[in-house]
């Protein structure tokens, strides 16, 4: 298995950021929970941090276990008014774990369909909370990492953070409900561009396209998100929560269908040669050569 971290500096031409779960780290919670205090008093705002910084907070089933525990803890907080989701270190979440992808190529379409849908639902579980969720995208948000941010209610991003949905470049159908969420957020044109091109853009361009609410300097991402959370939390809790539920109703109405469709489509992609080429390209730090016979310079 590959054991190096694919970071911004060793990805050729914007290939997806991946890491390997075999990298050794000191055992600690993979998701952190912190109460936001002002003058020593709890504001009703909780900060959730994905905590695998050496691997750019890659999403894994192991992280999903800690993530669900944190969401369950939040659900028991009677004073909860808002949640801010962010990443520890330099990344928000830079995609999937490479070892996990390799394992999927060895499994059957039937198992992969079931596994992927369960994986999606684990990380979308945070949407079961009745309060607004704000993503503070402090750094790279790629693939599944950006899908997670797009599933929240409001997004603030670092203006230089790379964000993108690089599934088709990898050789796989998009997942985690993103075919549904991004269309609801920005419409068909921008959704098609982001999903079909696999382009990685910077945070300021993401704001221009309407993918995020605000683009700020990297050291202002969390403070800006917390300021938004404080503004929201000063309003009527029952009104804010009921409005949040109403706003999510449209999103949720077709989400189950999208999750099932995505998981099924991904399960078929796992059995193709394209995903193998995509993974090989990541391991070799190069662009994948999908459909290479169509291009003279790649023969």
Curated annotation (Swiss-Prot):
Residue span of the annotated presequence: 1-14
EC number(s) stated in the UniProt entry for this protein: 4.2.1.-
Highest taxon of the lineage: Eukaryota
Record-linked CDD domains: crotonase-like (cd06558)
InterPro entries per the UniProt record, alphabetical: ClpP/crotonase-like_dom_sf (IPR029045), Enoyl-CoA_hyd/isom_CS (IPR018376), Enoyl-CoA_hydra/iso (IPR001753)
Major localisation: mitochondrion
Family designation: Belongs to the enoyl-CoA hydratase/isomerase family.
GO cellular component, one term: mitochondrion
Gene3D superfamilies, alphabetized: 2-enoyl-CoA Hydratase, Chain A, domain 1
GO biological process, one term: fatty acid beta-oxidation
Record-given protein name: 3-hydroxybutyryl-CoA dehydratase-like protein, mitochondrial
Subcellular location: Mitochondrion
Molecular function via GO: lyase activity
Keyword annotations: Lyase, Mitochondrion, Transit peptide
One Pfam family named in its UniProt record: ECH_1
């Amino acid at each position: 298995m590959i054991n190096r971290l694919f970071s911004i500096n060793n990805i050729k031409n914007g290939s997806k950021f991946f890491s390997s779960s075999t990298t050794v780290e000191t055992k600690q919670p993979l998701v952190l929970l912190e109460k936001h205090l002002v003058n020593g008093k709890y504001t009703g705002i909780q900060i959730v941090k994905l905590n695998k910084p050496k691997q750019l907070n890659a999403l894994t089933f192991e992280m999903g276990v800690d993530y669900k525990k944190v969401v369950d803890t939040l659900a028991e907080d009677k004073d909860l008014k808002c949640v801010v989701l962010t990443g520890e270190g330099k990344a928000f979440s830079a995609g999937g774990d490479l070892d996990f992808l390799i394992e999927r190529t060895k499994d059957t379409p039937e198992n992969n369909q079931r596994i992927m849908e369960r994986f999606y639902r684990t990380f979308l579980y945070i949407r079961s909370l009745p309060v607004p969720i704000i993503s503070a995208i402090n750094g790279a948000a790629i693939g599944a990492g950006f899908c997670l941010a797009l599933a929240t209610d409001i997004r603030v991003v670092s203006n230089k953070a790379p964000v993108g949905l690089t599934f088709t470049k990898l050789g796989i159908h998009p997942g985690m409900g993103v075919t549904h969420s991004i269309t609801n957020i920005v419409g068909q044109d921008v959704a098609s561009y982001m999903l079909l091109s696999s382009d990685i853009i910077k945070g300021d361009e993401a704001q221009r396209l309407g993918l995020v609410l605000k683009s700020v300097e990297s050291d202002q991402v969390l403070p800006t998100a917390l300021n938004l959370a404080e503004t929201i939390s000063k309003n009527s809790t029952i009104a804010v929560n009921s409005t949040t539920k109403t706003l999510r109703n449209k999103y949720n109405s077709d989400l189950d269908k999208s999750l099932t469709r995505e998981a099924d489509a991904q399960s078929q992609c796992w059995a193709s040669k394209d995903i193998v080429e995509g993974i090989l390209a990541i391991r070799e730090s190069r662009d994948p050569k999908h459909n290479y016979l169509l291009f003279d310079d790649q023969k």
